[in-house]
């Protein structure tokens, strides 16, 4: 049976804007109040997704969230018509309105943690939506995320969906952005790496001092239990608190893995050598490549600015691996020089392909943020909602949909415009028909 690693990219929503909501994310803060282009953002994402499909990879799309989120605004006391609620929120609590208008669900690396059937006791593919409790604008996502995942992976013979973890900082969970999987082949049992920022039940344990550690050890352990993973196929690694304080808010900003390659910065983890030894022991006899990038070649600041590690490492049909990188990596001399050297080294990585995802990058999300990886066999791929998979017809359909519904420019002050709410709901209602999702949004119920 054939096995694949599919990428499910987040479709950028109609309210994509730069509100600077993500403390700890340098790009998000630096671009606060800039003018965004929802249309360009969506098209950049679709273009990248289509390019990966054209490379022969299984590529899907996940629908965006309903924004502005009137349901949340009503929960926190705003009343009246939709237009009245938007007007009141803009005047009385503009920060809360901005949080309820974020298009952050585009970064599907934070949508959920996924464990493939080859790793789980029951032989099913498991999904746990991330609770994202550290950031208000993301903490309102998990229920709809669960709805969208269940509408996408909708065959209970193959897919097991869990509720997100309890909404408390002890279980702060940021999903696949702090999780990677190493394996010889996608269909073989692998080693799942859970990277965390702090251990909340141990006050004396290391933790960052400037920026929050969004992922807890307790959350990672809970997800592993839910997914029925054996201890001999899981490794828990603490991210270096110093790099969190330098803007590395998720592990996928400082490390990425694919099959038998772990690509990481030398400052990424605590107790690196001991953890690499544990990974190697649990990985077994097969060859594994630890590709460590030294600070002398790429400083943390350059890694964060370029998103060198927020790249996708993918296996092409030829068996070679390629890095899917943002064009920002070409524009950083140190990073570009390193990548040109990397493809000449004795590793499976032999190509670097560059994509313009600047609308996402300016909000702090690179190619890896935009995708949720799902390793599947051919029967599981066949069981996926086929209307969520990328192909020529769907690419054309979704681009026409974006052209019809999305604005060319959006400012933060536009978020209170009742017309934007109407445009967004009209677009999403049509999208659920294109992707055959059913009624996944509050306004449809």
Curated annotation (Swiss-Prot):
Pfam families: AstB. GO terms for molecular function: N-succinylarginine dihydrolase activity. Substrate binds at residues 19-28, 110, 137-138, 214, 252, 363. The active site is at 174, 250, 369 (nucleophile). One of its GO terms (biological process) is arginine catabolic process to succinate. It catalyses: N(2)-succinyl-L-arginine + 2 H2O + 2 H(+) = N(2)-succinyl-L-ornithine + 2 NH4(+) + CO2. Signal peptide: none annotated. Keywords: Arginine metabolism, Hydrolase. Pathway: Amino-acid degradation; L-arginine degradation via AST pathway; L-glutamate and succinate from L-arginine: step 2/5. SUPFAM superfamilies: Pentein. InterPro entries: AstB_sf (IPR037031), SuccinylArg_d-Hdrlase_AstB (IPR007079). Its EC number is 3.5.3.23. Catalyzes the hydrolysis of N(2)-succinylarginine into N(2)-succinylornithine, ammonia and CO(2). Belongs to the succinylarginine dihydrolase family. Homodimer. NCBIfam families: arg_catab_astB (TIGR03241), PRK13281.1 (NF009789). This is N-succinylarginine dihydrolase. The gene is astB.
């Amino acid at each position: 049976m054939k096995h694949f690693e599919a990428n499910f990219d987040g479709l950028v929503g109609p309210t994509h804007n730069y509100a600077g909501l993500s403390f700890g994310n340098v790009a998000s803060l630096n671009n606060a109040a800039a003018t965004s282009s929802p249309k360009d953002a969506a098209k950049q994402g679709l273009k990248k997704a289509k390019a990966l499909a054209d490379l022969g990879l299984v590529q899907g799309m996940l629908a965006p969230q309903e924004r502005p989120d009137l349901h949340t605004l009503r929960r926190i006391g705003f009343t009246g018509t939709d237009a009245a609620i938007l007007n009141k929120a803009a005047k009385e609590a503009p920060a809360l309105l901005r949080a309820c208008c974020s298009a952050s669900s585009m970064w599907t690396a934070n949508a959920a943690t996924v464990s493939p059937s080859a790793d789980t006791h029951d032989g099913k593919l498991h999904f746990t939506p991330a609770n994202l409790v550290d950031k208000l604008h993301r903490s309102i996502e998990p229920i709809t995320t669960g709805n969208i995942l269940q509408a996408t992976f909708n065959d209970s013979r193959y897919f097991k969906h869990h509720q997100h973890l309890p909404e408390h900082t002890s279980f702060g969970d940021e999903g696949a952005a702090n999780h990677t999987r190493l394996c010889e082949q996608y269909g073989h049992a692998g080693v799942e790496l859970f990277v965390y920022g702090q251990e909340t039940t141990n006050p004396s344990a290391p933790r960052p001092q400037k920026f929050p550690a969004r992922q807890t050890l307790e959350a990672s352990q809970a997800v592993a239990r839910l997914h029925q993973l054996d201890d001999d196929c899981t490794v828990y690694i603490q991210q270096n608190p110093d790099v969190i304080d330098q803007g590395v808010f998720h592990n996928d900003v400082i490390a990425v893995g694919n099959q038998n390659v772990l690509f990481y910065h030398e400052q990424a983890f605590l107790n690196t050598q001991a953890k690499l030894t544990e990974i190697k022991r649990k990985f077994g006899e097969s060859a594994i490549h630890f590709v460590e990038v030294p600070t002398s070649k790429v400083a943390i600041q350059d890694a964060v600015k370029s998103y060198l590690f927020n790249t996708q490492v993918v296996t092409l049909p030829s068996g070679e691996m390629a890095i899917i990188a943002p064009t920002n990596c070409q524009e950083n001399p140190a990073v570009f020089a390193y990548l040109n050297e990397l493809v000449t080294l004795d590793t499976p990585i032999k190509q670097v392909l560059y994509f313009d995802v600047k609308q996402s990058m300016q909000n702090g999300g690179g190619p890896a943020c935009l995708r949720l990886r799902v390793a599947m066999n051919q029967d599981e791929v066949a069981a996926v909602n086929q209307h969520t998979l990328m192909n020529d017809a769907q690419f054309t359909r979704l681009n026409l949909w974006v052209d019809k519904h999305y604005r060319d420019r959006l400012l933060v002050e536009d978020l209170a415009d009742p017309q934007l709410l109407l445009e967004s709901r009209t677009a999403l209602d049509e999208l659920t028909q294109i992707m055959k999702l059913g009624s996944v949004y509050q306004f449809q119920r």
